[in-house]
Amino acid sequence: MNEKIQRINFGKIREGLSLPNLIEHQTKSYADFLQLSVAPQERKAEGLHGVFLEVFPIESYDGKVKLEYVNYEIGESKFSPIDCLRDGKTYAAPLYVTFRLKDEEGVKEEKVYMGELPMMTPQGSFIINGAERVIVNQLHRSPGICFESSFHSNGKTLYSFRIIPDRGSWLEVAFDTNDLLYVYLDRRKKRRKFLITTLLRALAAALSGPSSPLGSGGDEEIIRLFYTVEELNLSEGIDEDKVATKVLVSEVKDPHNPDVVLARAYEPVTRSVVRQLLDVGIQSISVVDVQYDDTLIKCLKKDPTKDPVEALKEIYRRLRPGDPPTESNAKLLLKRLLLDPKRYDLGRVGRYKLNQKLNIQVDPDIRILTWEDLVAATRYLIKLRKGEGITDDIDHLGSRRVRTVGELVANQCRMGLARTERLVKERMTLFDVNTEGMTPQKLINPKALSATIRDFFARSQLSQLMDQINPLSELTHKRRLSALGPGGLSRERAGFEVRDVHPSHYGRICPIETPEGPNIGLIATMASYSRFNDYGILETPYRKVLNGKVTNEIVYFTADQEENYVIAMANTAVSEDGTILDQRVAVRFRREFMEVEREKVEYMDVSPKQIVSVAAGLIPFLEHDDANRALMGSNMQRQAVPLIQPEAPIVGTGIEERVARDIQAVIVSEVDGTVSSVTGKEIIVTPTGSPVEQKKKKSKQGSEREGIVYKLNKFMRSNAGTCINQKPIVKKGQVVKKGDVLADGPSTQNGELALGRNLLVAFMPWNGYNFEDAIIVSERVVKEDLFTSIYIDEFEIVARDTKLGPEEITRDIPNVGDEALKNLGPDGIIRVGAEVKPGDILVGKITPKSETELAPEERLLRAIFGEKAADVKDSSLRVPSGTYGIVMDVRVSSGTARVRKEKINASEAKQKIKEIEERYDQKEEELREELTQALSNILLNEKIPLDVVNVETGEIIIPANRKITKVLLRKMAQAYDKIEIDPSPIRSKIFEIIGNFEAKFEQLRNDRELELDQIESGEDTEPGIIKQVKVFIANKRKLSVGDKMAGRHGNKGVVSKIVPVEDMPYLPDGTPVDIVLNPLGVPSRMNVGQVLETHLGIAAKKLGFNVATPVFDGVKEEKIREFLVKAGMDEDGKSILYDGRTGEMFNQRVVVGMIYMMKLNHMVADKIHARAVGPYSLVTQQPLGGKAQYGGQRFGEMEVWAMEAYGAAYILQELLTVKSDDVQGRTRIYESIVKGENYLETTTPESFNVLIKELQGLCLEVNIGQRSDVIGLSVKPTTPKALSGGEAA
């Protein structure tokens, strides 16, 4: 038994919260989308249920027929996740939806199959066509409102706001240089803009009703929304200074003569105006004060429209220039753009953001734009222009949110159902004349929905093949946040600001882990403790602080909420009872760092590692590494290949075990119990106190398989080609507790993540072999397989039915000798266990050649021998170059089309069916024996006063009052589902036992049917496919020169030399070092963490313990010195070293210690390549490039210059002609080499001919001539007619 690794944790900070489940955000999101655990009638209007409620009911155009949605249910998946991975299937379950059709005839309810819905595995991934995929969470601009400012070329600041819906047109309102407010819909600039007052008037028409405060949409109603209207009494006299900023609300007419306008609307109140009004007897007027702002007054003056209908037409004219505007058309357009919930939806988040930002109380269920939103937003914009309030930072996490798996799939379902809706309406119209035969099944075509979902999972930018190199890469992929994808940013458009680290990322997005290259900053990773709230906004936890004392209350804050509080760091000194010790504390407040008195602290970080991601949290002494190197370190841990002998790090950070558990790389016991059986393929744990365990104590009878069975994954191929293999770490009879690790997986040791090995390192130069980050490795590391990994390559071949006849997988291949066929079986498929090299045949296949006119003798042969004499070519599957290994598995699947036609396939199918039947008959017999044993415990040698009757045959199995024997009990077990006994106490006991076994019998029957279905359905191969063969080749790769290695601190390098153990530098006690690194790799890179790790590693190794040094709370330097002295070393960690070759001592003492190194997925075996004979490009006739194409090396322009500099004319001629694209020259030099001559004759290179053709395409006539050994070239303009010899017009 392997003991659990015990680590001494040097973290001084008491964490207020343990790490959450690291993949829960994926599983919870999809569970919320499906709501499987909720009864159909109790489901919330969200996820899949919400999408159906949005689209349905669907009414016919005439309103006579209505199709309503009732509920949905999801069936059981046909195959288990493991079967889907093995057989290349999709892990999905059938979706059944109940619809109700209401027409003139009545109501019809029917359950309709809507296709297969991919199901999430417990690990948070999907299996699509046999490959594990992850749906990456998308970080996008949050729906809601955003206030911005920009600078005009005249130096003026122009303010604007943008209302972004979840679905629908964007609405932007912006100031222009004349302080007028213009509206832009869908970012349409230039002529398609209109004034804000025009939109408000139009909304008055669209929202006409008693509750609308816009009333009739007149000027006065609009003014009252933004200004306080005062009544000015003129008879009391006026103070000119007080009324200087007041203007009239509406025009004033002469009461005696209404045609005379005494004062116009918005005219300033002056002494002359007042006198004029008093003269006609007007005592008071309505005015507004425009001292604060006159924007709306200016807009009303400029507005060409005066009533709502005019406003509607004006908007229509702007958005649909050229179309004649009518009131109904204009109203319909505005409703479609902003007021139709099916076309315009702010979403839950958008409504929440609008209410929060504008401080309004609109009902959360109203998700269209309201007059209240527009008025409040315009008021806020006017305040901004006056210097009140602040603009929004679009890079702040408060302005961004996450679309989770559930939401992304729901959006696809919405698109699919929108297509279904159109089809349903069309079909309703077709049935219009006669609704008699109309049913929901006939109206609905499920293909629209299933095709959309399938397309999303297979092709979407956010559905990615899972990064499966090791468990950490898998976990990080599931915790990734992408700003790319549909509705997101594009690489080319994204500037520096959106990629940069932002203060609001603290505790939510890791500031370290992001890819290097074009995606830097666009793809981020969730921080360790972060989670999404119900609105998809990232939150991070804090501990509440009351009067300078830290409580255990945990509160989650979004980036917006956090800015209102004073928050202390996690490393603030705290006493045992939670009291903050320092009088003044370093805190964060409104994105700034400052010091305050401890009483002012309101919250505190829960852990120092809450700001970094899981991968960065695995780097010990992260606080001593430069950020760039930490980024490389966290990225390279994800590239570490699983080793065949993994070893957990001596110096860890304490979260290694959580990573292995949460990603389910290790198998964990679900119960307290005893290990009853251990094999390489499964572990069985019998729960403590279970009836089986008690029975075993009483007697030695009973099945060994009783208990919980844990199946182990054995030598499975990951997406990256690495090996997934689980091995037991418990023994039979061992007592385990719930949560104990039963089996290790890839890159784990005793339940902890183990990506590499601990090696004895020396930081010193060694004969120049570790120049420029190169790494010197001891031969011991290679011999003992410390860095050996297993790779599994998959090769596939398909035999199809072609026009010329069927392809055939066979051993009978033309023109192939016996030597090449020695490892093939009689069916033409390589045997498992065969050792293969490049060029070997894996699967023999022949394909019919195109038919040609046959000679009489061939026709005779064809007539005598049938199809076999037909002309066929060899199209066998061969091992590609660079691949060596052993065939570990072969999988063959046959198509249905030919099972009936080909005798061999039919007999194979029969044989398989027979085997399945026999296997399940045996299992059923074993289960009946168990039932007999269970019945024996209460009935053997007993008598019961009632008859036990077989209700099907009427036979009395056990007569009343007869002594019950084992034979009778077996008879009873045979007919367990057909027996009947009159009511009595013994009856309930018997039926209780039978009831326990019924589910097991049912499961067996289902499994049997499933396997038989698979045989009969031809294993679901595509149409036209006769046979499909997959061959898996395992390849054991040792560490070799050219392989890339790295530590956890971004200290990467390539193995430059593998040195014999006796030549390696050694310690005074004779121990040779394992690896030599260049000390110059440390100072300029500023990743001192590797040196501290080296010192602490050797001390811990000598003192016999493992270390956990959490990030930002690690071991202090003094403590490391103390350990080094305790371990009998110098406190500076340096040792005397001797040269292995000479035995002499090196001049300087050297840093020697234990460092954790990983082998990365960049191996020389994958990269090394040389071309001998290979394919050429069709156009240029030059060799192709790249290893995949078996290409050559490009001899480019600069290389030509180098040759010219040396005057190597003949080598250059050879390179640019016969070795490249001189087609005739290639043939001739081949002939001369075969003949043993050394003669080079060149002709015109093909690329020159291509150039001439291109010039001719530009109507330039090119002529090549030769005069007295000088080749001349003339280029002159011409016409298409001349070039084509008169063919072209």
UniProtKB/Swiss-Prot annotation:
Record-linked Gene3D superfamilies: 2.40.50.100, 2.40.50.150, 3.90.1100.10, DNA-directed RNA polymerase, beta subunit, external 1 domain (2.30.150.10), DNA-directed RNA polymerase, subunit 2, domain 6 (2.40.270.10), RNA polymerase alpha subunit dimerisation domain (3.90.1800.10), RNA polymerase Rpb2, domain 2 (3.90.1110.10)
EC number(s) stated in the UniProt entry for this protein: 2.7.7.6
Gene Ontology MF terms: DNA binding; DNA-directed RNA polymerase activity; ribonucleoside binding
GO cellular component labels: DNA-directed RNA polymerase complex
Keyword Transcription in record: yes
GO biological process: DNA-templated transcription
Cystine pairings recorded for this chain: none
InterPro entries in the record: DNA-dir_RNA_pol_bsu_ext_1_sf, DNA-dir_RNA_pol_bsu_external_1, DNA-dir_RNA_pol_su2, DNA-dir_RNAP_su2_dom, DNA-dir_RNAP_su2_hyb_sf, RNA_pol_bsu_bac, RNA_pol_bsu_CS, RNA_pol_bsu_protrusion
Catalytic activity field: RNA(n) + a ribonucleoside 5'-triphosphate = RNA(n+1) + diphosphate
Keywords: DNA-directed RNA polymerase, Nucleotidyltransferase, Transcription, Transferase
Keyword Transcription: yes
Protein family per UniProt: Belongs to the RNA polymerase beta chain family.
HAMAP family noted in UniProt: RNApol_bact_RpoB
PANTHER family: DNA-DIRECTED RNA POLYMERASE I SUBUNIT 2
General function of this protein: DNA-dependent RNA polymerase catalyzes the transcription of DNA into RNA using the four ribonucleoside triphosphates as substrates.
Assembly and interaction partners: The RNAP catalytic core consists of 2 alpha, 1 beta, 1 beta' and 1 omega subunit. When a sigma factor is associated with the core the holoenzyme is formed, which can initiate transcription.
Name of the featured protein: DNA-directed RNA polymerase subunit beta
Organism lineage: Bacteria, Pseudomonadati, Verrucomicrobiota, Methylacidiphilae, Methylacidiphilales
Gene: rpoB
